[in-house]
Amino acid sequence: MGYGQYERHTRRRCNNTSLTVTIIALVVCLVLALTGFALSLTGAKRAAQELNDKNAQQEARISELEKQLEQSDVNALKEEIERLQKELEKANADKEALQEQINELNRRLEAKQQQNGELAKKKLIALTFDDGPGSRTTPELLDFLKEHNVKATFFVIGINAKKHKDILSRMAAEGHVVGNHSDQHKNLKNLGSVEEIKKAVSECNEIIKEATGEYPVLLRPPGGSTNALVKQACKEMGMSIILWRVDTLDWKSRDKDKILEVAFDKNSPYSIRDGAIVLMHDIYPTTVAAAKEMILRLESEGYTFVTVPQLLQARGGMEPGNVYHYAFPS
């Protein structure tokens, strides 16, 4: 082989070798590229799967929350139904209780009307006692009234009533009526307004309510002094003004015999008669003694002892703000 041929042969071999190397390099690059792509694809698939799993978890959570919300709405509705059911049951119970109260009041009204009709035909007398209660005299008087089944009306002063609430409670418990004689026995006519008059009797009203369970419906102004303002104040407070027909002047004489003499003076138009309201004061021992004899005499003369409201209801009724001295038979 000549040198030229050898050189050409050598160049071809080199070229072939270079081509082979190039091809191998390309193959290696391709393999690496495919491997990287495969890895990337695997990573992408894995990421996609993770995303799908996460989405599935979120969808499951959303579904669970929707179920909880739906159940929550159901529970809320159930609770509301139960609440309304309880309210309905209570309303029905209240209605039944109210109806029973109405029935009871109707029975009492019928009984009162019948009693008033019967009382109206009898000789009636209403004994009233002012300025108490006295710590010793009033309980003694109450003992006698209870013994003889006599009902009376007591007009108490606030400053005294406050000290003897137990006596007021006893009065009410034994069927007597407790009325207001002002807080401090001041002349109500000297007060300049309806509000001042109300203020002058309001504390006594509260004391009576606390002791007896009921607000008084009767006011006896100190000294019997009244005017348009006093009447208006009483009307607004739902109270009737109770004066008297028979003034025994027991506060002045302090003498049992003179008290009885004034009360039964046949020559006086202001002595005891059917329908009269009698004024006395239960803070004096002489008054208590006179009241005992008076009751015995009136019993013998056929009188029925009534409270002021009983007297007025039997003989025409009473209205807030009106003034009453007596209730004579028509």
Say what each PLM segment does.
Residues F37, A44, A48-L51, N55-Q58, ...:
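Long, heptad-repeat coiled-coil alpha-helices used as oligomerization/scaffolding rods
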